[in-house]
């Protein structure tokens, strides 16, 4: 875990992205290679810290802070990087929300960018003709389960309100990994093999 000596970070950002890995198989089966996460280390800092579920995303967040970006910038860069290197932990095809507390202004903010129902959706699209609920997984599987993604728009809104670095600097690492590749974890390899055609 990286401990940063970044001064003047006076706010806390909590980012929860909505992601979905739909499967009927238990997770233990997906991890048939026996991947075990690195030993958890405990770290503390008075000024700031970056931690994510993937080391490349953590490095990107640290880089953004070291370039003078704020926690909002780092969270945006981390979110886009996770969409590439660990899609189940963050993706641009979903949505989420951000709860923000700015210590300097003592103001809380919430930005909701959850997925939205498509324009042609109806309130009874998951019901049978008699008005009873259709239990055939229509709301979770297939074309009727699709929502309009909100992640990119939500992260853009965070950037416009609170960001300090240019947008292109925040997404450049995600673009780099998408174009040039990266070493995947055994766990992601297992999932890709399990669901390959």
Feature locations, PLM:
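Bacterial N-terminal signal peptides that target proteins for export
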Residues: 1-10
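Bacterial N-terminal signal peptides
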Residues: 10-20
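Long, structured ligand/cofactor-binding scaffold of large enzymes
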Residues: 63-65
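Noncatalytic scaffold domains of N-terminal-nucleophile
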Residues: 24-59, 71-72, 76-197
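Residue-level micro-sites within transmembrane alpha helices that shape
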Residues: 6-7, 19, 72
């Amino acid at each position: 875990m990286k401990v940063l000596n970044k001064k003047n970070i006076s706010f806390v950002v909590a980012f929860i992205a909505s992601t979905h890995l739909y499967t009927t198989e238990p997770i233990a089966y997906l991890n048939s290679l026996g991947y075990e996460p690195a030993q958890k280390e405990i770290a503390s800092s008075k000024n700031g810290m970056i931690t994510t579920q993937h080391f490349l995303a953590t490095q990107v967040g640290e880089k953004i802070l070291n370039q003078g970006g704020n926690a909002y910038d780092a969270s945006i860069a981390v979110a886009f990087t996770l969409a590439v290197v660990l899609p189940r932990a963050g993706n641009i095809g979903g949505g989420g929300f951000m709860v923000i507390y700015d210590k300097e202004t003592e103001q809380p903010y919430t930005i909701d960018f959850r997925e939205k129902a498509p324009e042609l959706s109806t309130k009874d699209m998951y019901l049978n003709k008699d008005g009873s609920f259709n239990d055939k997984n229509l709301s979770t599987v297939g074309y009727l389960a699709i929502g309009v993604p909100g992640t990119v728009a939500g992260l853009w809104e965070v950037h416009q309100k609170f960001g300090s670095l240019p947008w292109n600097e925040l997404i450049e690492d995600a673009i780099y990994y998408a174009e040039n590749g990266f070493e995947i974890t055994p766990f992601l390899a297992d999932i890709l093999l399990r669901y390959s055609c």
